[in-house]
Amino acid sequence: RAIRDVYKRQALGLPCAAVYLLALVVFIPFRYFGSSMYGLPVDVVGRGASAPGVHQDLASFLSALLSIYSGTLLGFVDDVLDIRWRHKLPIPLLSSIPMLVVYMAGGGSTSIVVPAWPPLLRQALGCSSVHLGWLYYVFMMLLATFCTNCINILAGINGVEVGQALVIAVSVCINDVLYLNIPGVIRAAWESSSDTPSPAHILDGYHGSTDLVVRHLFSLHLLVPFIGTSLALFLWNRYPARVFVGDTYCYFAGMVLVSCGILGHYSKTLLLFFFPQIFNFVLSCPQLFGLVPCPRHRVPFVDTGSRTLYPSCVRLTEHAFPTRLILALLEQLGCVQRIYDESGQVVGTTNLTLLNALLVLRGVRVAPASKADLLASKSKTDPVLRPAPVRHTLCVSEHALWYYTMGVQALGSAMAFTVRYWLSSIIFPAT
């Protein structure tokens, strides 16, 4: 039993990515069959279906494949060589170059709309939009870096990497479908004497904007196969996991999502669906920037007696005022638990991650650190503190923690839709 639980197949995100890329390559002839895009005549789609428009769309599609392929390859290299964090951060920058070049060659917009509320902003700038130029490309490169690494940072329990990517992908697909005239297609199919009504009805979508519809169809063509392959991988990676996805899947999933956002021209909307990942990054900042010691692994600990999880901890080597202030504030918010020794002095804290924060919020507590615990955590390179859990507090299994995490991810998607379709109509009334 112990051998089956310990020795798992690693980096199984690679077969998932390989099947996905193969499916998209096979899909290319069906996507561009005939003389126009999606099999629609030129007089229906307009200039977007002409030869230059089809070539530009094909270039975008191939650049997405190249970026996803390079991200997957570099992720697999990371799994094999175990690259350090400071070296792996620039990897997505290299993978994003093909799609950014195609975005630039296609005349992609580099302007942002200035919020209409408060009115002082537009009055001060004297315009309703600001042209960022090369700064917009810097933003998109940073977005590629964030989307790939944030999935990797929010990891540590069975199924959480694939689960969060699936929730985000399904949410983005729902957002894409909102731009399509699905009722019009159904109505045309019901009223048409032909068994297969013209697909032109799909282009009567969002406020009559053909460009928006084509962009979101492009996004759907990338996301639907991704959801299918990820679901198959999830069946093997869910608790109790039979395989591990590795960094390969994290890079692969991040590049798929960021390719849809950049080439679909909704990069800012895509960022809204990463609310939990943004929270996890902000929560981790004190450890990432050295205010609190950061061990190599911050995943929750397993209580061997009950087989449940409790927050992992780190020993505090310094007690600077900013560190004490941040930890006191986070403890008041219920995100961390400070660890005390037998004399009542603060000697450690739970690690600053979303998974540990959920355990603390659910009431899982850690006992005061003993002298033996403190002696065992004197390593400066990996200052892990391992106090025992408080047995009479709430116990949370790994399976339950996965459900809590997915609930937070779904709540983040609901917040994203609220911001995108309600709050944005107040701040950007003209758009």
Per-region residue spans from a language model:
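"…together with the soluble PPM/PP2C metallo-phosphatase catalytic core" -> "…together
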Residues: 1-288, 416
